[in-house]
Amino acid sequence: MSKYLATSVRLCLMVCIVGWLLMPSYKELDGWCSSLSSLERDKSNWLLTGLSTWFCIVPSGTDQSSLVSYFSPLEKLSKFVQDLDLDFVKLWWLETITLINTLNTTEKLLSGVTFSVVLWYPRILVTVLMLVWKLWFPVRFLVVASSLLCLRILVWPFEVIADVILETCAWFTRKYHKLMDVIEDLMMIPQRVMEWCSGNTAKMVVPTVASCVSESIESKLDRILMALGRKGTVLEAAQPGSDFVECEQWPNGLVAIRRHDGRIVGMGFLVVLNGKWRLVTAAHVARECKRGIMLSAGIDSKTVTFQDLDVVLQTQVDACIMNVPAGTAASLGVRKVVINRTPSESKVVRTYGYNSGKFCMSEGLVGTTSANMGFRHGCSTLRGWSGTPIYRDNKVVGIHSRCNGIYENFGLSLDLLVGRLESEETDRYARTMEEFNTEDRPVTPPMEFSWEFEEKFERVRSTRKSFARIESEVATFTATKLSGFDWTDDAPMDFDELPVFESTMVSVFQERPLGGLPISNGNKAEEKKITSEALEPSKSSTPEAAKHTRRRRRNKKKSKNSETGHGPEEQSQQQSRPSSPIPDDSAPVSSPPVSPPSTGSVPKSWTQAYTQKLVLLLGSMDGQSKEKVDLAILEAKSFASALFPPSKPKSSEESEK
């Protein structure tokens, strides 16, 4: 009995000694947690710190001695772990402290951003660490003691608890690694710590630790994280290698567009079109100013306020042109700017906007162009930069619209505003469209293009006509006030839902055709009514229903004649033409209200009948499997053969090919 009592006393004494030895570690951990809380409270002294793979931004005015104090809790904890003779704990601690340190970095970067999951990770890991530290050493001691006393079964529950805690930490580590893999790709790889002073000069503080090449990294990560999945909103994106540089000179034509409360919603530029000053910006920027619009320009931010403006043109490619009163440019001190064609790929362009209240610029390269009047560009943008003109050699070559992915900023070409009086068919978009204007084009699955892609040519053609009327002296615009403008908010104006660029050809088996959007102010109720009426015939597969399918493209001569005319008659015809998934050039001209589309043309050949029937069948399918497509092909062939019996086997075989 006395033997067991003596053993119990020894065990209690050893537990007390171990607990006493661990007390300083608890204090160190509590001190580290309190220092983390103090950093959270003091947002002006936030620190982005890490080990060898991460970077550190030092607040302005921080010297080398005070920089060491930031790392003191981390160094003390690391020293304590190194003194322990536990290899597993050392390795696990080094990995965990790196993760916590990086989480602290992320939390400071995400200051003010709704990203609650990331903000909670440091607190969860600290709590888990404290539990592991409190349980690991007593459990290890009890396991060793129980193995000597043959009482291992008594401490088995403590082992299970320790294993569960360690597995929990490992689970958090794996989850966090996945998160940081995403964020790490968005950050710049630095080499040394830099302290930013006044102007654009930088002073080295601590060499070979980490670096920061821009003081706006917080804003960059903020915008990039916003671009990770807010569907339905206009997004911006920072571009690799394109930094924000503060400017002291205001470019020609540029204006900042503000709402009635003074908040910047986008940028734009003033330009003379057809002898009048016009404001050009993105359409989604203009619709934010229904209750009033303010224009500001210059480093000193001269401002003019308008209760309302006349919307001259709203295109289907997110562009908007408004009339401004005479003398607006002079009041703002804005100099005249010239519009030029979009340059070729790899040419350097610039964009301008505000970053944390400072007027900045960013440079990038022109990327691939699109047949949808668009092109990629590598200039970094922030929220509030939509509609900003894209400059090259002090000339506007496009307007920034939005991002089409994390590393894809999208601009709209203004080629249609350049040289309109010289020729109607000189730009590359017209030439691209003419290549597709082949009558009775055979359709053989699998298609190399989708009907959605073909519909976008139709939208661009209508947009081209609208742009042409701006340069016409005889055109009379029925301008709509900005406050009463009925914007089409039901769907994006001309952007793919899929993460592909507009010029990418998508298979018809992956994407179903969508309808066009109105050029002028669209009435939602009428648009929904017409869309439903236009889609009703697709439920049937009769020959009469085939008349409601898409009309084939006219030949090149007819297309040119239809696009060159621009006058009051064409304008009234364009305004009376409804927006439906079935483009029809034969809509009535005289009726002001929106009317249903015409039934289309009767097929004139076997190929045309086969094409119309096949498109109708594919468009009415819920899912397009290979079996359904084969049945649709057979039914379309039977339908075409019934209307046009083959007279010669040769012509029939050619048609089938």
Curated annotation (Swiss-Prot):
Single GO MF annotation: serine-type endopeptidase activity
InterPro entries named in the record: Peptidase_S1_PA, Peptidase_S1_PA_chymotrypsin, Peptidase_S39B_luteovirus
SUPFAM superfamilies to which the protein is assigned, alphabetical: Trypsin-like serine proteases
Annotated active site: H284 (for protease activity), D318 (for protease activity), S386 (for protease activity)
Cellular component GO terms held in the UniProt record: host cell membrane; membrane
Residue ranges of domain Peptidase S39 in the record: 239-434
UniProt EC number: 3.4.21.-
Transmembrane spans: 4-24, 46-62, 109-131
Keywords (A to Z) from UniProt: Host membrane, Hydrolase, Membrane, Protease, Serine protease, Transmembrane, Transmembrane helix
GO biological process, one term: viral process
Regions of compositional bias (Basic residues) in chain numbering: 548-559
Residues covered by region (Disordered): 513-605
Biased composition (Basic and acidic residues): 560-569
Cell compartment(s), UniProt: Host membrane
Topology versus the membrane: Multi-pass membrane protein
Biased composition (Low complexity): 571-589
The protein's role, per its UniProt record: Putative serine protease.
Family named by the database record: Belongs to the peptidase S39B family.
Record-given protein name: Putative serine protease
Organism per entry: Mushroom bacilliform virus (isolate Australia/AUS LF-1) (MBV)
